[in-house]
């Protein structure tokens, strides 16, 4: 089984370099210096205008832990909907409980918003 070369990018230039280097898929982020945040919609549009490479967008509204409030979950679901409309092929998501377990209840609105796309947890 062949692997997939996914490259994390946060700019048009890094996306172009990844594509030229043979990437199969991009993980699109912003602010990699803080571990990555949700990318700007305009950056997705720029890349999509130049390439049909598969793009999964990180959904992370802030730096720090992965314990999200209900308002943050609603924001994340809205971000998924917007980026999905603009051509994202999938999303990279994750919510944790205070015990460090996957918070499946918190992730339900995100899974619903991302329906029909690829997911990385």
Mark where each language-model region is.
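Hydrophobic faces of well-ordered beta-strands that scaffold small-molecule active sites
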Residues: 3-7, 26-28, 47, 55-59, ...
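Active-site-adjacent beta->alpha loops and helix N-cap segments on the catalytic face
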Residues: 12-16, 20, 32-56, 70-78, ...
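Non-catalytic positions within long, well-ordered alpha-helices that form the structural scaffold/packing
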Residues: 19, 84-85
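Short acidic/histidine-rich motifs immediately flanking catalytic phosphotransfer sites
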Residues: 22-23, 87-88
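A short acidic, helix-capping loop that chelates divalent metal ions and anchors anionic groups
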Residues: 62-68
């Amino acid at each position: 089984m062949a692997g997939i070369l996914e490259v994390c990018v946060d700019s048009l230039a890094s996306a172009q370099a990844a594509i030229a280097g043979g990437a199969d898929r991009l993980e699109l982020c912003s602010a990699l210096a803080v571990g990555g945040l949700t990318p700007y919609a305009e950056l997705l549009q720029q890349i999509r205008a130049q390439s049909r490479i598969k793009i999964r967008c990180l959904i992370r509204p802030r730096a720090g832990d992965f314990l999200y409030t209900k308002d943050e979950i609603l924001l994340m679901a809205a971000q998924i909907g917007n980026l999905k409309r603009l051509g994202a092929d999938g999303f990279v998501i994750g919510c944790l409980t205070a015990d460090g377990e996957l918070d499946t209840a918190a992730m339900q609105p995100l899974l619903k918003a991302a329906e029909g796309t690829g997911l990385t947890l």
